[in-house]
Amino acid sequence: MSKYMILIHEREADYATMTPEGWQSVVDAHSAFTKAVADLGGTIVGGEALQQTTTATSIRSGEVTDGPFVESKEALAGFYIVEARDLDHALEIGKLTPAPFGGVEVRPVLDAPAAGGR
């Protein structure tokens, strides 16, 4: 099994006005996702939701600035690291990832021993 990162990009503004019931539906969707990954034969290795971009600090060329690097309607909201058989399997898992206000990006995690032979 190989590792893949599922990056969840969503519109923060939609979460700012969400009701408690809306939040519960998001939590329920992620719980169902966890079960679905196992049912597909994958494994969630880790993952977290991220705080709003207003809490981000960026460093570029040694210069520290508040906020993310670029202005965008969608921001990185969270991520999962999953183990999947191959990219097709990871994409199948990625399609199930809850992102009601955006979408996801699936990327292979670089295998450190293989890094020298990129």
Residue ranges of model-derived segments:
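Conserved, structured core segments of small domains
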Residues: 1-118
